[in-house]
Amino acid sequence: DMTLENPLCVLNVMKRHYDRYTPEMVAKVTGMDPDVMMKIWQVYAGTGKPGKAGALLYALGQTQHTYGGQNCRAMSIVQLLLGNIGVPGGGLNAMRGEPNVQGATDVACTVPDLPGYLKWPTAKKHRHLADYLHAETYADGYYSNKPKFMVSFLKEFFGENATVENDYGYEMLPKIGPRLPASAWTTMGTFHMMRDGRIKGYFAWGMNPAHSTPNAKFARNAMANLDWLVCADWFPTETATFWKAPDMDPAKIQTEVYFLPAALIYEKIGSISNSGRWVQWRQQGVLPPGEAKSDFEIIEVLFDRIRSLYQKEGGVYPDPILKANMDYKVDGKYDLRAVCWAINGYTVQDGKLLPGYAQLQADGSTACGMWIYSGYYNNEADKLDPMKQPTARRSKEDPSGMGLFSGWSFAWPANRRVLYNRASCDMKGRPWNPEKVFVEWKGDKWLQYDVGDFVTANPPDNKAFFMTWEQNARLFSYAMADGPMPEHYEPFESPTKNLLNDSVQAPCALFTEDKDNRRGTTQDYPYVCTTYSVTEQWQTGAQTRSIPWLNELISCNFIELSEELAKEKGIKNGDTVRVWNNRGSVKVRAMVTIRMQPMQINGKLTHVVGMPHHFSWAGSFATGDNGNDLTPNVGDPVSFIPEYKAFLVNIEKAA
């Protein structure tokens, strides 16, 4: 409805939905000073006009909630309404908590996706390949090419065993079954199944769930039910030594634990992807010590041994193992370059690397492990030399003058630096900001200073988002499990009621009814706690807590609290304090600061305290109690991320 008058026009639906969100109500819910809040809104809303731009940068403070996905949706809607998507200086930009989180999600270390964000098939909806392609292929937009992406993926996955007669091996691809949803296979879900005896073996690849998992004490108890545990890591982490935790009895734990020394990032070659989707190649700095191996080599050796056992002994259904295309070798040796060829894609007949994903086909003539990366390693003439591939480019020239640096590494897809850059122009192809131009319609063609994120053969129209079937942005989205438009909910544990609707917590939040969450109330736990990082430590501290000079800077865990709360509780800076709730109890040092301040939430004075998540009992130097013993194992229904950022505790000066 171009007149925006129809009551079912999305913009009008949004207006009605958010009528309750008055400035006064928002200030009451959030505890923000109303004048400061209005000033922020006014300044940022000023970016919503031609020649202006505003960027939203966010991190785990927005995502680690039971409504984290909707937080991101809300920011997306703000940026779309202001015209800040696809323009120079705009965007909704994630500040990742790890160097290669982007790469990990790209290659599908998450539950619901295959590599390249192809949906993982479900047994009920996608029984056959035709069912999958019918359900997942868009009628218009670039995902109308999904059959090319999926068939090429299957062709790489099963190689010569993927034929048109067997649907390119689709029947062998594991499906999400009807009995257990995808959430059951997330980090939190797997520990519930460990507790219940449904999972008997566990691999921890460069992760430390005995420390990092929410409600970590619950996770450690669940691990005690395992028959075996394999840890591939740099140091003996809390997970590798979980039976030594202060709250565990080693005599009662029969789990067989195998520790595989893994190579550090500096001790192996490979690519790393940042938040800008730049896939950057890294050379090996030094050889790994002793028996340490890269994750790639460990997986390859393990798979070869497993396949050998299936060949000798058979099994219930050995085909997916025996027919998998897992021979990533060069001259008979495991070689990551062969993985790069598989990811980039190649023609099946002659093995030549593809220039990019535009060459993918749905007839089995091309193979490609991850379509979005196609083109990142495409120099066929020097395919054995990573340093002569697009991913290793290091040009410092920037003809755009806007920080695109298109000759530095490779940005997926197609070396496109800014997604949705068609939105930087009006419907006639004229840039909103003539001084900063990504793309521009001149005469009878598009001039491109960045790779166009649209069908550049077409003249200007109103289609700026060609990864959706309608090729428009979505203010109203049917892709979210918890609703088409963001709505406010309180955390799983909250000091207040929900002032905006009758449901206190997000109704679709995961695991909220699980018996081991042990929800607390303000009657027993009156203070809101949040977790965060410090510059001097890294994640669970496996590496940084083994470096002496870093631990001279931050040597122990602490609770950060306001001067007002410290005075009320008789706590001084440096005191040892006890912090506890229904899930656990920890002793840490007090850090009294003005950074933490009481807030007026729904007219009530509310204290907030904060605690880093880096410390626990294992480590060479700095050790201590684990703050994640207090966090609840509940999560977002879309991203499955835990709610580390808000929960209830009590605090007192330790005896």
Model-derived features with residue positions:
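Long, contiguous, secondary-structure-rich segments that constitute the structural scaffold
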Residues: E297-D350, D450, A457-P460, S477-E487, ...
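Flexible, glycine/charged-enriched surface loops at secondary-structure junctions
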Residues: G51-A55, G86-M95, K312-I321
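Long, C-terminal catalytic modules of enzymes
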Residues: G270, R277-Y377, D382, M387
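Flexible glycine/proline-enriched surface loops and loop-helix/loop-strand junctions
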Residues: P7, Y21-M25, L57-Q62, W278-P288
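Extended redox/cofactor-interaction regions of prokaryotic respiratory oxidoreductases
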Residues: D1, V13, K28, L80-E256, ...
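Glycine/threonine-rich phosphate-binding loop and adjacent beta-strand/alpha-helix elements that clamp
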Residues: T255-P288, V592, H613
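Phosphate/diphosphate-binding loops
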Residues: D227, C231-T237, T241-W243, L287-F303, ...
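Long, well-ordered, tryptophan-enriched scaffold segments
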Residues: D1-P50, Y138, Y143, I299
